[in-house]
């Protein structure tokens, strides 16, 4: 059973979302994230890292579009403006983004390189096309058994922004519901690779 679906990219980073994502993806503490971001800012690699704005300048949006079109093709590009919902947000500052969008990597220690890459990918993804998915339920029957297994998740039809960046979540349940499944067809035979017993 399949239903068409789509997934939009997350906005570029604010201070708090950068801290959360760096913790989930890189294992950084809040203080570590801010110390590394401070270095990146001082070296001219990123915009100011203390902001609660998700806005990008028109210059940044144009630069992101150029990188996306040149590396992935026009179908992956979808320039967009994000609105900052926080009252009294520091609109004077942009979201946290690379100073130069076309700069894929930087010199520096491993932490600096990892955080820069995270910021760049999130920024580019925010300016990319939605992912087109099919919400899918797969029912697996076992020969000679009356019980069936069921897998619920999503199959990617067009990867869009997911080609560059996938957001993490703290809640495992949210992750499970959005699990990506391989494209299969009715009647396909599956090979057993692992059986794992879990208590619920």
Predicted features by range, described:
Residues 82-105, 110:
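Acidic, turn-prone loop/beta-hairpin segments
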Residues 1-38, 73-74, 107-200:
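Long, highly charged, low-complexity internal segments
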Residues 17-21, 44-45, 95:
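A general alpha-helix detector
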Residues 46-48, 83, 93-97, 149-150, ...:
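Generic preference for hydrophobic/aromatic residues in regular secondary structure cores
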Residues 21, 49-51, 99-101:
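Short strand-loop junctions, especially beta-strand C-caps/beta-turns
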Residues 28-90:
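Extended, well-ordered alpha-helical scaffold/bundle regions in very large, multi-domain proteins
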Residues 52-56, 102-103, 155-156:
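Conserved nucleotide-binding/hydrolysis micro-motifs of P-loop NTPases
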């Amino acid at each position: 059973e399949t239903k068409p679906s789509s997934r939009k990219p997350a906005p570029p980073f604010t201070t708090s979302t950068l801290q959360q994502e760096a913790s989930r993806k890189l294992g950084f503490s809040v203080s570590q994230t801010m110390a590394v971001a401070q270095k990146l800012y001082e070296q001219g690699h990123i915009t100011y890292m203390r902001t609660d704005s998700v806005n990008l300048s028109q210059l940044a949006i144009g630069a992101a579009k150029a990188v996306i079109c040149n590396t992935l093709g026009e179908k992956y590009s979808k320039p967009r403006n994000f609105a900052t919902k926080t009252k009294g947000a520091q609109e004077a500052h942009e979201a946290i983004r690379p100073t130069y969008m076309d700069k894929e990597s930087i010199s520096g220690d491993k932490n600096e390189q990892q955080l820069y890459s995270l910021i760049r990918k999130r920024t580019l993804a925010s300016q990319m096309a939605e992912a087109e998915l099919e919400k899918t339920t797969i029912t697996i029957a076992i020969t000679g058994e009356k019980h069936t297994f069921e897998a619920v998740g999503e199959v990617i039809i067009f990867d869009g922004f997911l080609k560059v960046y996938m957001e993490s979540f703290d809640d495992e349940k949210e992750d499970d519901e959005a699990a990506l499944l391989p494209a299969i067809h009715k009647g396909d035979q599956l090979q057993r690779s692992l059986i794992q017993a879990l208590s619920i």
